[in-house]
C-alpha cells in the first residue's frame, strides 16, 4: 500500500509518527578545510534534498588525515561545524589523546570507537531515519555496523570504480587501512550485499558495484547534478569576470588548455603536459592551466621542462567555484584524462572537451557529437583531439554547446533531487 507523505512545519518530510526525517552521512570525500578553500558548500548542503530531510549530519570520520595543522589539531575530540539550520558537519580525528600520539594504532582505535559511540547516541537521540555511506570500504563498514545496532537502513553511494583504479595503479584504494586489494574486494562484497540501497554516481560506477555484490533491485544512479555549484548552470555568455580571472592567473582568454582535478597518477594529469608539448610542436603557442593539487606536481613540471613547455605551465592549485565557473568558458579546450564532477562542470561551461574513454566519461562525451573521446591512455590521440579544437574554432564552439546541452539534460538538479527523494521514500517505506 502506498504511504502518505506529510510535510512538517520545518520543511522536512515526516515519518508516520509525525517526526521529521533526518539523515546521517558518513563520507570522506572532503574535509571542512577543503570545502571552505574550494567554495563547495553546495556539495554538502544539497544533501537535504531541498528540505526532504529536516536535518543532515555529515561526518568525516578521519578528517585530520588530510587537514593542515593550522586548521585543527590532529588528535582530540571530534569538531562540529554548523553550516546552516539544516546542516551540521562533524570532523573525526586520527587520535583521541595527545599523550598517546606515538601509539598511533591504539590512539586511532580509541578515537574511532569514541566517534562510533557518539554516532550511535546521535541516531537514537535525533531519531535519524537513514544512514548514507560515501564508499563501500571504511565508511561502508561503519555505516553497516551503526545500521545493525540501531535497526535503520543504510545507503552506499559509489563515487568511483575501484577495480579500474587498481587496474591502472596496481594499488588498493585505502592501502594504510586494508593493505591489499584482495582484502578490499572482500569488504566491498560484504557491504554491497547488505546495503539497503546502492547508488552509483554514474552507470560505470554502478556497474562496478553490481559486479561486486550489489543487488539489482536495490541499486540506482545518483548523478552529480545536484552536487554542483549552481553558478555552473549559468549560461557561459552570462558569466561575468572571466577576463579578470584569466588575467589574475596569467592566461589569455582562448589561449590556454584547462585541466581540473587532482595531480595524482590515477588521473593521468601528466598526459596534459604531453598534449601541450604536441600542440607547441604544431605551432600552437598555448599555455596549460592546472587547477588542483597533488603529489605529481614536481614530476609534471620536470616533464614540461623536458618537452620545452615548462614556461607555459601554470599550477594554480584549488580555486573557488566562482572563479572556476568564470574560467571554464574562457579556455581553448578542457583536457580530461580522467575526471568526475569536474567533467560535469566543464560541460556546463560550454567548453570543448577532449577526454579518455574511462569511467563515466563516455556517458557524456561522444566523439564529434559532444566532444572528442579517445582510447584510454592514448596520449597522442588525446593531443590530436585537442588540436582539432584549437585549429577549428567553429567546431570547438559547436562541441562546447552540444556538451552543455547534454549536461543540462543529464544533470538537471531538480530532476535528480526528485529521483533521490523517490528512492528514499521507497527505502523508508520498506523499513517500517
Regions found by a protein language model. Name each.
Residues 178-240, 251, 315:
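Donor nucleotide-sugar binding/catalytic pocket of nucleotide-sugar-dependent glycosyltransferases
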Residues 192, 318-319, 325-331, 346:
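Short alpha-helical donor nucleotide-sugar binding micro-motif in glycosyltransferases
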Residues 1-81:
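N-terminal subdomain of nucleotide-sugar transferases
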Residues 328-339, 351-352:
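Acidic donor-binding loop of glycosyltransferase active sites
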Amino acid at each position: 500500500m502506498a504511504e502518505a507523505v506529510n510535510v512538517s512545519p520545518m520543511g522536512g518530510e515526516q515519518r508516520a509518527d509525525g517526526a521529521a526525517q533526518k539523515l546521517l552521512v558518513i563520507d570522506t570525500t572532503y574535509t571542512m578545510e577543503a570545502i571552505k578553500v574550494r567554495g563547495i558548500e553546495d556539495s554538502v548542503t544539497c544533501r537535504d534534498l531541498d528540505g526532504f530531510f529536516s536535518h543532515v549530519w555529515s561526518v568525516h570520520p578521519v578528517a585530520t588525515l588530510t587537514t593542515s595543522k593550522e586548521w585543527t589539531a590532529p588528535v582530540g575530540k571530534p569538531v562540529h561545524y554548523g553550516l546552516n539550520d539544516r546542516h551540521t558537519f562533524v570532523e573525526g580525528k586520527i587520535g583521541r589523546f595527545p599523550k598517546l600520539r606515538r601509539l598511533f594504532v591504539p590512539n586511532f582505535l580509541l578515537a574511532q570507537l569514541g566517534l562510533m559511540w557518539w554516532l550511535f547516541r546521535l541516531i537514537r537521540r535525533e531519531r535519524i531515519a537513514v544512514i548514507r555511506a560515501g564508499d563501500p570500504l571504511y565508511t561502508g563498514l561503519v555505516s553497516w555496523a551503526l545500521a545493525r545496532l540501531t535497526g535503520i537502513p543504510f545507503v552506499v553511494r559509489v563515487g568511483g570504480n575501484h577495480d579500474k583504479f587498481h587496474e591502472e595503479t596496481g594499488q588498493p584504494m585505502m592501502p594504510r587501512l586494508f593493505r591489499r586489494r584482495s582484502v578490499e574486494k572482500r569488504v566491498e562484497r560484504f557491504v554491497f550485499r547488505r546495503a539497503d540501497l546502492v547508488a552509483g554516481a554514474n552507470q560505470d560506477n554502478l556497474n562496478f558495484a553490481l559486479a561486486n555484490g550489489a543487488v539489482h533491485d536495490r541499486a540506482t544512479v545518483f548523478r552529480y547534478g545536484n552536487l554542483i555549484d549552481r553558478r555552473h548552470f549559468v549560461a557561459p555568455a552570462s558569466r561575468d569576470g572571466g577576463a579578470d580571472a584569466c588575467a589574475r592567473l596569467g592566461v589569455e582568454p582562448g589561449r590556454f588548455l584547462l585541466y581540473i582535478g587532482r595531480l595524482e597518477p590515477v588521473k593521468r594529469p601528466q598526459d596534459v603536459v604531453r598534449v601541450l608539448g604536441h600542440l607547441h610542436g604544431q605551432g600552437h603557442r598555448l599555455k596549460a592551466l592546472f587547477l588542483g593539487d597533488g603529489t605529481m606536481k614536481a614530476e609534471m613540471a620536470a616533464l614540461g621542462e623536458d618537452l620545452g613547455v615548462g614556461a607555459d605551465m601554470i599550477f594554480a592549485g584549488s580555486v573557488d567555484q566562482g572563479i572556476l565557473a568564470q574560467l571554464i568558458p574562457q579556455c581553448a579546450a578542457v583536457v580530461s584524462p580522467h575526471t568526475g564532477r569536474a567533467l560535469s562542470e566543464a560541460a556546463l561551461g560550454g567548453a570543448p572537451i577532449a577526454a579518455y574513454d574511462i569511467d563515466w566519461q563516455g556517458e557524456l562525451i561522444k566523439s564529434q557529437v559532444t566532444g572528442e573521446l579517445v582510447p584510454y591512455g592514448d596520449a597522442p590521440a588525446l593531443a590530436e583531439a585537442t588540436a582539432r579544437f584549437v585549429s577549428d574554432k567553429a567546431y570547438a564552439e559547436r562541441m562546447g554547446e552540444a556538451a552543455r546541452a547534454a549536461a543540462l539534460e543529464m544533470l538537471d538538479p531538480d530532476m535528480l533531487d526528485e529521483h533521490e527523494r523517490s528512492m528514499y521514500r521507497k527505502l523508508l517505506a520498506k523499513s517500517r
